[in-house]
Each structure stands twice: as C-alpha cells, then as structure tokens.
Amino acid sequence: RHQFLEHTFSPTQGYGASYVRISIGCNDFSSKEYTLCDKPGLKHFALQNDEISYVLPILREVLDINPQLKIIAAPWTCPRWMKVKDLQTLQPYESWTDGHLNPAFRKTYAQYFVRFIEAMHDKGFNIYAVSPQNEPLNRGNCASLYMSWEEEASFVAELAPAIKHANLQTRIYVYDHNYNYDNIASQNGYPVQVIDSLNKLKFAGSELV
C-alpha cells in the first residue's frame, strides 16, 4: 500500500498528486450505507468506523508523503431523517437512494457539514473544499440525494454563512458531476461570491470549462 501511495502522491518519487476527494459518510465502495448522524439530531453526529479505521489512517499516510495534499469532501446522501420524497408533499423518505433534502433542514444540514469539517480538523486534517452533493442529478446511486441546481443554490445560501460563521476557510465547489450533464461552457450565472469552482467529475463527456 505504501509503495502505491508513494508512487501516486510523492512529488519527488512519484506522480505528485496533491488533491484527493473523500466522502462525508458512505460512498459507492462502503460496506454498508451510513451517514455521520443516522439518528435525528446533530447531538448524535460522529465520525464512524470507516473513517476512523480506514480513511483517516490512509490520509495520514498520504499527508506524510505529500504535506501539500488538499482534501475535498462530498456526501453521497444526507441523513435519511432529513429527506423527503418530493418538494410538493414533503413526505418523509426513508430510502438511502434518491429523495430530496427537506428545505426545513437546510440550516441543520449546513451545520452537519461544519461538524464534519471541525471533526476532521480535530483529527489533524484540513478540509480544503466541500461540495454540497456527489452527482446531484443521479437518483439511482446506492446512496444518493437528488439536488437540482435550484436546490443546491438554496442550500449553499445556508452552507456558506455557516462555514464563515464557524471561522473556517473551507471552500465550496458545486456541480460535482460529469462534464456532459449540462454542456454549459462557462460559470456565468453561478453565485461566484460564495462558490469557488465547478467541480465536474471526469467520468464522462468532454471538458467545457
């Protein structure tokens, strides 16, 4: 493992990659679906076994190899108690897959991000940037949350002040998705005063920005 990490991240002995992306809670490769606060109420927030036993030790190893490492983090889903089936009925939605963030929990979910950034800082890791949602237009992932452009903008309107109020320097990247999902050639129209970048994933499509 160390040899692979050194070949990947060492600026002198390897490729010198200095940017990694991690999940806030579970992702496609997790052994089970979970968030960092599965019980209602942020008093239950805590890093889980996957973070403590696997993610953090590897991040520490990478940081020892390349101290210039930047970490971006994104959730695959919000806690299920924050989900609704749709924005018309606001019916609670208990599935890990699909659903929407309940507008009533935007402020709470923003604090969820703050708690994560602070928890990682307490473990010795600076979160350089967050994105509000992994693949926000993908309804079918094992753990997912549908977040339209309008929903993401409304959430960022809560997230940006929450990060600033907590005296954190973490950036916000938006549209954490494939290049070919919108085919928009520029960032014009995005709220650039609080958003640092489009964070398009290189899974599909041609780069337009």
Residue locations for each model-derived region?
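N-terminal catalytic cores of secreted or lumenal carbohydrate-active enzymes
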Residues: 1-127, 147-153, 157
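Active-site neighborhood of glycoside hydrolase catalytic domains
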Residues: 107-129, 136-209
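Solvent-exposed loop/turn segments at secondary-structure junctions
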Residues: 26-29, 77-81, 134-139, 177-181
